[in-house]
Curated annotation (Swiss-Prot):
Subcellular location: Virion
Disulfide partners: none
Function of the protein: Intermediate capsid protein that self assembles to form an icosahedral capsid with a T=13 symmetry, which consists of 230 trimers of VP6, with channels at each of its five-fold vertices. This capsid constitutes the middle concentric layer of the viral mature particle. The innermost VP2 capsid and the intermediate VP6 capsid remain intact following cell entry to protect the dsRNA from degradation and to prevent unfavorable antiviral responses in the host cell during all the replication cycle of the virus.
Biological processes per GO annotation: fusion of virus membrane with host plasma membrane
Protein name stated in the entry: Intermediate capsid protein VP6
GO cellular component: viral envelope; viral intermediate capsid
UniProt xrefs under InterPro entries: Rotavirus_A/C_VP6
Key words, A-Z: Capsid protein, Intermediate capsid protein, Virion
GO molecular function, one term: host cell surface receptor binding
Species of origin: Rotavirus X (isolate RVX/Human/Bangladesh/NADRV-B219/2002/GXP[X]) (RV ADRV-N)
Oligomeric form and interacting partners: Homotrimer. Interacts with the inner capsid protein VP2. Interacts with the outer capsid glycoprotein VP7.
Membership in a protein family: Belongs to the rotavirus VP6 family.
Length: 396
Protein backbone atom coordinates (compact mmCIF):
# COMPACT_ATOMS: atom_id res chain seq x y z
CA UNK A 1 0.00 0.00 0.00
CA UNK A 2 1.35 3.44 -0.92
CA UNK A 3 0.85 4.96 2.56
CA UNK A 4 2.63 2.06 4.26
CA UNK A 5 5.51 2.28 1.78
CA UNK A 6 5.79 6.02 2.47
CA UNK A 7 5.88 5.41 6.23
CA UNK A 8 8.60 2.79 5.71
CA UNK A 9 10.74 5.24 3.76
CA UNK A 10 10.33 8.05 6.31
CA UNK A 11 11.19 5.64 9.15
CA UNK A 12 14.34 4.60 7.30
CA UNK A 13 15.28 8.27 6.76
CA UNK A 14 14.70 9.02 10.45
CA UNK A 15 17.07 6.20 11.42
CA UNK A 16 19.71 7.59 9.07
CA UNK A 17 19.33 11.09 10.53
CA UNK A 18 19.58 9.74 14.08
CA UNK A 19 22.76 7.91 13.11
CA UNK A 20 24.42 11.23 12.30
CA UNK A 21 26.35 12.95 15.06
CA UNK A 22 26.41 16.76 15.23
CA UNK A 23 29.65 18.76 15.30
CA UNK A 24 31.60 16.10 13.42
CA UNK A 25 32.78 15.81 9.85
CA UNK A 26 30.13 14.60 7.41
CA UNK A 27 31.18 11.90 5.00
CA UNK A 28 29.45 10.64 1.87
CA UNK A 29 26.65 8.75 3.65
CA UNK A 30 25.87 11.77 5.80
CA UNK A 31 25.78 14.07 2.78
CA UNK A 32 23.39 11.66 1.06
CA UNK A 33 21.13 11.67 4.12
CA UNK A 34 21.03 15.47 4.20
CA UNK A 35 20.30 15.57 0.46
CA UNK A 36 17.43 13.10 0.87
CA UNK A 37 16.03 15.13 3.76
CA UNK A 38 16.29 18.36 1.79
CA UNK A 39 14.52 16.79 -1.18
CA UNK A 40 11.47 16.09 0.99
CA UNK A 41 11.76 19.44 2.79
CA UNK A 42 11.72 21.34 -0.50
CA UNK A 43 8.48 19.61 -1.49
CA UNK A 44 6.67 19.55 1.85
CA UNK A 45 7.82 22.46 4.04
CA UNK A 46 4.86 24.69 4.82
CA UNK A 47 2.30 22.37 3.24
CA UNK A 48 -0.98 21.95 5.14
CA UNK A 49 -3.08 18.78 5.12
CA UNK A 50 -6.58 18.44 6.58
CA UNK A 51 -6.50 15.10 8.36
CA UNK A 52 -7.93 13.41 11.46
CA UNK A 53 -6.43 14.34 14.83
CA UNK A 54 -6.48 12.24 18.00
CA UNK A 55 -10.11 13.08 18.71
CA UNK A 56 -11.10 12.14 15.14
CA UNK A 57 -11.70 15.74 14.07
CA UNK A 58 -10.48 17.12 10.76
CA UNK A 59 -7.62 19.47 11.63
CA UNK A 60 -4.91 21.26 9.66
CA UNK A 61 -1.50 19.60 9.94
CA UNK A 62 1.37 21.74 8.71
CA UNK A 63 4.79 20.33 7.88
CA UNK A 64 7.76 22.24 9.32
CA UNK A 65 10.87 20.98 7.51
CA UNK A 66 13.37 23.76 6.84
CA UNK A 67 16.02 23.02 4.24
CA UNK A 68 19.42 22.32 5.81
CA UNK A 69 22.56 23.95 4.33
CA UNK A 70 25.14 21.49 3.11
CA UNK A 71 28.51 21.79 4.82
CA UNK A 72 31.39 19.61 5.90
CA UNK A 73 30.30 19.75 9.54
CA UNK A 74 26.71 19.26 10.74
CA UNK A 75 25.89 21.74 13.50
CA UNK A 76 23.82 20.82 16.53
CA UNK A 77 21.07 23.23 15.47
CA UNK A 78 20.86 21.71 11.99
CA UNK A 79 20.75 18.18 13.39
CA UNK A 80 17.94 19.12 15.78
CA UNK A 81 16.11 20.88 12.94
CA UNK A 82 16.28 17.73 10.82
CA UNK A 83 15.03 15.57 13.69
CA UNK A 84 12.17 17.97 14.44
CA UNK A 85 11.30 18.19 10.74
CA UNK A 86 10.92 14.43 10.47
CA UNK A 87 8.79 14.38 13.64
CA UNK A 88 6.57 16.97 11.97
CA UNK A 89 6.28 14.62 9.01
CA UNK A 90 5.36 11.75 11.34
CA UNK A 91 2.54 13.87 12.80
CA UNK A 92 1.11 14.14 9.29
CA UNK A 93 1.58 10.41 8.65
CA UNK A 94 -0.13 9.49 11.94
CA UNK A 95 -3.07 11.69 10.98
CA UNK A 96 -3.06 10.07 7.54
CA UNK A 97 -3.33 6.62 9.17
CA UNK A 98 -6.32 7.75 11.24
CA UNK A 99 -7.94 9.26 8.14
CA UNK A 100 -7.33 6.39 5.73
CA UNK A 101 -8.00 3.79 8.43
CA UNK A 102 -11.48 5.21 8.99
CA UNK A 103 -12.46 4.31 5.44
CA UNK A 104 -13.76 0.76 5.08
CA UNK A 105 -12.44 -1.47 2.31
CA UNK A 106 -13.69 -4.92 1.31
CA UNK A 107 -10.56 -6.14 -0.47
CA UNK A 108 -6.79 -5.73 -0.28
CA UNK A 109 -5.91 -2.15 -1.21
CA UNK A 110 -2.66 -0.88 -2.72
CA UNK A 111 -3.51 2.82 -3.02
CA UNK A 112 -4.86 5.40 -0.59
CA UNK A 113 -8.41 6.50 -1.32
CA UNK A 114 -8.70 9.64 0.81
CA UNK A 115 -7.67 12.65 -1.36
CA UNK A 116 -5.73 14.42 1.41
CA UNK A 117 -3.83 11.23 2.25
CA UNK A 118 -3.00 10.66 -1.40
CA UNK A 119 -1.84 14.28 -1.66
CA UNK A 120 0.52 13.82 1.32
CA UNK A 121 1.88 10.57 -0.11
CA UNK A 122 2.61 12.22 -3.46
CA UNK A 123 4.20 15.29 -1.84
CA UNK A 124 6.53 13.24 0.36
CA UNK A 125 7.47 11.29 -2.72
CA UNK A 126 9.60 8.48 -1.25
CA UNK A 127 8.63 4.86 -0.68
CA UNK A 128 10.07 1.59 0.56
CA UNK A 129 8.37 -1.80 0.41
CA UNK A 130 10.23 -3.21 3.42
CA UNK A 131 9.45 -2.53 7.08
CA UNK A 132 11.35 -3.77 10.12
CA UNK A 133 7.98 -4.91 11.49
CA UNK A 134 7.01 -8.00 9.46
CA UNK A 135 3.30 -7.43 10.10
CA UNK A 136 3.55 -4.19 8.13
CA UNK A 137 4.75 -6.26 5.18
CA UNK A 138 1.78 -8.61 5.14
CA UNK A 139 -0.15 -6.58 2.56
CA UNK A 140 2.91 -6.90 0.32
CA UNK A 141 2.76 -10.65 0.89
CA UNK A 142 -0.95 -10.70 0.02
CA UNK A 143 -0.26 -8.98 -3.29
CA UNK A 144 2.70 -11.29 -4.08
CA UNK A 145 5.25 -8.47 -3.87
CA UNK A 146 7.15 -10.09 -1.01
CA UNK A 147 7.67 -13.50 0.59
CA UNK A 148 6.68 -14.24 4.17
CA UNK A 149 9.46 -13.48 6.64
CA UNK A 150 11.09 -16.06 8.90
CA UNK A 151 10.95 -14.66 12.44
CA UNK A 152 10.88 -15.85 16.07
CA UNK A 153 7.30 -16.43 17.24
CA UNK A 154 5.80 -16.36 20.73
CA UNK A 155 2.98 -18.89 20.41
CA UNK A 156 4.07 -21.97 18.47
CA UNK A 157 1.69 -24.33 20.32
CA UNK A 158 -2.01 -24.41 19.52
CA UNK A 159 -4.28 -23.91 22.53
CA UNK A 160 -5.62 -27.33 23.40
CA UNK A 161 -6.99 -29.46 26.22
CA UNK A 162 -5.16 -32.74 26.59
CA UNK A 163 -7.69 -35.01 28.24
CA UNK A 164 -7.99 -38.77 27.82
CA UNK A 165 -9.62 -41.63 29.71
CA UNK A 166 -9.09 -45.15 28.38
CA UNK A 167 -10.24 -48.14 30.41
CA UNK A 168 -8.83 -51.60 29.88
CA UNK A 169 -10.11 -54.69 31.68
CA UNK A 170 -10.90 -54.34 35.36
CA UNK A 171 -11.06 -50.84 36.85
CA UNK A 172 -11.55 -49.38 40.31
CA UNK A 173 -12.51 -46.05 41.84
CA UNK A 174 -8.91 -44.94 42.53
CA UNK A 175 -7.87 -44.88 38.86
CA UNK A 176 -6.84 -48.51 38.50
CA UNK A 177 -7.27 -49.95 35.02
CA UNK A 178 -7.22 -46.55 33.33
CA UNK A 179 -4.78 -44.76 31.08
CA UNK A 180 -5.54 -41.10 31.68
CA UNK A 181 -4.21 -37.70 30.64
CA UNK A 182 -5.01 -34.34 32.19
CA UNK A 183 -3.28 -31.30 30.76
CA UNK A 184 -3.23 -28.08 28.77
CA UNK A 185 -1.03 -26.52 26.13
CA UNK A 186 -0.85 -22.96 24.81
CA UNK A 187 1.75 -20.46 23.68
CA UNK A 188 5.14 -21.97 24.44
CA UNK A 189 4.09 -24.23 27.31
CA UNK A 190 2.40 -27.58 27.76
CA UNK A 191 1.82 -29.37 31.09
CA UNK A 192 0.42 -32.90 31.08
CA UNK A 193 -0.14 -35.35 33.94
CA UNK A 194 -0.03 -39.01 32.90
CA UNK A 195 -1.86 -41.53 35.11
CA UNK A 196 -0.95 -45.12 34.24
CA UNK A 197 -3.45 -47.38 36.01
CA UNK A 198 -2.49 -50.47 33.98
CA UNK A 199 0.48 -51.66 31.85
CA UNK A 200 1.16 -50.04 28.50
CA UNK A 201 2.48 -46.78 27.11
CA UNK A 202 0.37 -43.63 26.74
CA UNK A 203 0.60 -41.42 23.63
CA UNK A 204 -0.57 -37.84 23.13
CA UNK A 205 0.08 -35.00 20.67
CA UNK A 206 1.01 -31.35 21.00
CA UNK A 207 -0.14 -29.52 17.87
CA UNK A 208 1.61 -26.47 16.46
CA UNK A 209 -0.29 -23.43 15.18
CA UNK A 210 2.10 -23.22 12.23
CA UNK A 211 5.06 -25.37 11.14
CA UNK A 212 8.10 -24.19 13.07
CA UNK A 213 11.49 -25.25 14.38
CA UNK A 214 13.49 -24.28 17.43
CA UNK A 215 14.58 -25.44 20.88
CA UNK A 216 12.42 -27.06 23.55
CA UNK A 217 12.98 -28.47 27.00
CA UNK A 218 11.18 -31.37 28.67
CA UNK A 219 11.28 -32.00 32.39
CA UNK A 220 9.17 -33.67 35.07
CA UNK A 221 7.20 -31.76 37.69
CA UNK A 222 5.94 -33.13 41.02
CA UNK A 223 2.71 -35.00 40.32
CA UNK A 224 -0.50 -34.37 42.31
CA UNK A 225 -1.63 -36.81 44.99
CA UNK A 226 -5.25 -36.98 43.85
CA UNK A 227 -6.57 -35.87 40.48
CA UNK A 228 -10.04 -35.90 38.96
CA UNK A 229 -10.01 -37.72 35.63
CA UNK A 230 -12.00 -36.62 32.62
CA UNK A 231 -15.16 -38.52 31.71
CA UNK A 232 -13.85 -39.50 28.30
CA UNK A 233 -16.69 -41.06 26.31
CA UNK A 234 -18.87 -41.58 29.37
CA UNK A 235 -22.22 -39.75 29.73
CA UNK A 236 -21.84 -36.24 31.18
CA UNK A 237 -23.89 -37.14 34.27
CA UNK A 238 -21.46 -39.90 35.32
CA UNK A 239 -19.46 -39.44 38.49
CA UNK A 240 -15.79 -38.83 37.60
CA UNK A 241 -13.02 -40.99 38.99
CA UNK A 242 -10.69 -39.47 41.57
CA UNK A 243 -7.38 -41.14 40.85
CA UNK A 244 -5.02 -41.59 43.79
CA UNK A 245 -1.56 -41.02 42.41
CA UNK A 246 2.05 -41.72 43.32
CA UNK A 247 4.78 -39.66 41.68
CA UNK A 248 7.22 -42.19 40.17
CA UNK A 249 9.55 -39.65 38.55
CA UNK A 250 12.41 -40.83 40.79
CA UNK A 251 12.69 -44.00 38.70
CA UNK A 252 11.89 -42.39 35.35
CA UNK A 253 14.68 -43.39 32.97
CA UNK A 254 15.92 -42.72 29.47
CA UNK A 255 13.77 -44.76 27.12
CA UNK A 256 10.61 -44.33 29.18
CA UNK A 257 9.68 -41.53 26.80
CA UNK A 258 9.78 -41.24 23.01
CA UNK A 259 9.32 -37.85 21.32
CA UNK A 260 8.51 -37.80 17.61
CA UNK A 261 8.48 -34.63 15.55
CA UNK A 262 6.03 -34.83 12.66
CA UNK A 263 5.46 -32.70 9.58
CA UNK A 264 2.33 -33.36 7.51
CA UNK A 265 1.98 -36.78 9.16
CA UNK A 266 5.57 -37.83 8.48
CA UNK A 267 8.14 -38.34 11.26
CA UNK A 268 11.07 -35.97 10.66
CA UNK A 269 12.95 -36.48 13.94
CA UNK A 270 12.81 -38.22 17.30
CA UNK A 271 14.35 -38.36 20.75
CA UNK A 272 14.05 -40.69 23.75
CA UNK A 273 15.09 -38.62 26.73
CA UNK A 274 14.21 -35.56 28.77
CA UNK A 275 16.27 -32.40 28.54
CA UNK A 276 16.83 -29.64 26.01
CA UNK A 277 16.35 -30.55 22.36
CA UNK A 278 16.79 -28.75 19.06
CA UNK A 279 13.73 -29.82 17.09
CA UNK A 280 13.36 -29.77 13.30
CA UNK A 281 10.62 -28.12 11.25
CA UNK A 282 7.38 -29.78 12.38
CA UNK A 283 3.70 -29.16 12.93
CA UNK A 284 3.13 -31.75 15.67
CA UNK A 285 5.01 -33.22 18.61
CA UNK A 286 3.91 -36.78 19.42
CA UNK A 287 4.95 -38.06 22.85
CA UNK A 288 4.77 -41.68 23.98
CA UNK A 289 5.46 -42.14 27.68
CA UNK A 290 5.50 -45.14 30.02
CA UNK A 291 6.11 -44.13 33.65
CA UNK A 292 5.82 -47.70 35.02
CA UNK A 293 6.47 -51.18 33.62
CA UNK A 294 6.85 -54.83 34.60
CA UNK A 295 10.51 -54.47 35.59
CA UNK A 296 9.74 -51.64 38.02
CA UNK A 297 6.78 -53.60 39.36
CA UNK A 298 9.14 -56.36 40.61
CA UNK A 299 10.13 -54.25 43.62
CA UNK A 300 6.95 -52.23 43.97
CA UNK A 301 5.42 -50.76 47.11
CA UNK A 302 2.28 -52.43 48.45
CA UNK A 303 0.27 -49.52 47.02
CA UNK A 304 0.94 -51.01 43.57
CA UNK A 305 -0.20 -54.55 44.39
CA UNK A 306 -2.28 -55.97 41.54
CA UNK A 307 -1.28 -53.07 39.29
CA UNK A 308 -0.94 -55.35 36.22
CA UNK A 309 -4.57 -56.41 36.76
CA UNK A 310 -5.73 -52.80 36.98
CA UNK A 311 -6.85 -52.91 40.59
CA UNK A 312 -3.97 -51.22 42.45
CA UNK A 313 -4.81 -48.96 45.39
CA UNK A 314 -2.70 -46.12 43.92
CA UNK A 315 -1.51 -45.42 40.38
CA UNK A 316 1.95 -44.59 38.95
CA UNK A 317 1.92 -40.97 37.78
CA UNK A 318 4.25 -38.37 36.28
CA UNK A 319 3.69 -34.75 35.25
CA UNK A 320 5.51 -33.63 32.11
CA UNK A 321 6.41 -29.97 31.52
CA UNK A 322 7.12 -29.04 27.89
CA UNK A 323 8.58 -25.59 27.30
CA UNK A 324 9.48 -24.28 23.86
CA UNK A 325 12.39 -21.97 24.61
CA UNK A 326 12.41 -20.42 21.17
CA UNK A 327 10.79 -21.15 17.84
CA UNK A 328 10.90 -19.62 14.39
CA UNK A 329 8.33 -19.73 11.63
CA UNK A 330 7.02 -17.74 8.70
CA UNK A 331 5.09 -14.78 10.08
CA UNK A 332 1.38 -15.00 9.37
CA UNK A 333 -1.66 -13.03 10.49
CA UNK A 334 -2.42 -15.58 13.22
CA UNK A 335 1.06 -15.89 14.74
CA UNK A 336 2.16 -13.83 17.72
CA UNK A 337 5.62 -12.33 17.99
CA UNK A 338 7.50 -9.54 19.73
CA UNK A 339 6.49 -7.16 16.95
CA UNK A 340 2.90 -7.00 18.22
CA UNK A 341 3.71 -5.27 21.50
CA UNK A 342 4.96 -1.89 20.24
CA UNK A 343 2.17 -1.52 17.71
CA UNK A 344 -0.47 -2.47 20.30
CA UNK A 345 0.99 0.15 22.66
CA UNK A 346 0.44 2.82 20.00
CA UNK A 347 -3.16 1.63 19.70
CA UNK A 348 -3.69 2.90 23.24
CA UNK A 349 -2.04 6.28 22.61
CA UNK A 350 -1.53 7.74 19.13
CA UNK A 351 -4.03 5.43 17.45
CA UNK A 352 -6.74 4.88 20.04
CA UNK A 353 -10.03 3.59 18.68
CA UNK A 354 -11.67 6.95 19.42
CA UNK A 355 -9.24 8.68 17.05
CA UNK A 356 -10.85 6.89 14.09
CA UNK A 357 -14.14 8.40 12.97
CA UNK A 358 -15.19 4.87 11.96
CA UNK A 359 -13.74 1.60 13.21
CA UNK A 360 -14.60 -2.07 12.64
CA UNK A 361 -17.41 -3.21 14.97
CA UNK A 362 -17.15 -6.22 17.28
CA UNK A 363 -13.34 -6.20 17.22
CA UNK A 364 -11.09 -5.89 20.28
CA UNK A 365 -8.72 -2.96 19.71
CA UNK A 366 -5.45 -4.91 19.69
CA UNK A 367 -3.09 -5.87 16.89
CA UNK A 368 -3.87 -9.57 17.21
CA UNK A 369 -7.62 -9.01 16.90
CA UNK A 370 -7.23 -6.65 13.95
CA UNK A 371 -4.98 -9.11 12.14
CA UNK A 372 -6.99 -12.28 12.67
CA UNK A 373 -10.02 -11.79 14.92
CA UNK A 374 -12.37 -9.69 12.80
CA UNK A 375 -15.55 -10.95 11.09
CA UNK A 376 -14.95 -11.90 7.43
CA UNK A 377 -16.71 -8.81 6.07
CA UNK A 378 -14.32 -6.53 7.98
CA UNK A 379 -11.06 -8.50 7.85
CA UNK A 380 -9.45 -6.54 4.98
CA UNK A 381 -10.33 -3.28 6.70
CA UNK A 382 -8.88 -4.33 10.05
CA UNK A 383 -5.73 -5.70 8.45
CA UNK A 384 -5.18 -2.44 6.59
CA UNK A 385 -5.35 -0.54 9.89
CA UNK A 386 -3.06 -3.04 11.64
CA UNK A 387 -0.43 -2.99 8.89
CA UNK A 388 -0.33 0.82 8.83
CA UNK A 389 0.11 1.02 12.61
CA UNK A 390 2.75 -1.74 12.49
CA UNK A 391 4.75 0.27 9.96
CA UNK A 392 4.48 3.42 12.10
CA UNK A 393 5.65 1.54 15.21
CA UNK A 394 9.15 1.25 13.73
CA UNK A 395 9.86 4.95 14.19
CA UNK A 396 12.27 5.99 16.90
Amino acid sequence: MDLIETINAVVELQHRVRNLSPNTNIYQDGQTTINDYNAIASRCNGKVYNLRDQIAQLSPFQVHMPVIPISTILSTDDHETMSAGIESLFDVLAAAIRTEGSRQNRAVVTKSIEPEVLKAVLDIGIRSQFSENPYANMLQVDTAKMEQQLEPIDDPLASQKINMLAAGGATNNTGGGYHALVGRATGKTGVVTIIQGRPGAVTFNLNMKVPCSGVLSLTLLPAPGVIQLSLGNQPPNNIPVHAECVDVSTVFAEGDIVIRFELAGRVVGNANKLGTLNFPLCDRISITIEPWNANKQNNANANFNNWPAGTAQRQPTVSLFVNIINASSLIDYETHSKYLAGATYLMGTTFSEDSFIASPPNVVWTMSSLLSGAPPQYIHWTRKIACMIAAFSCKI
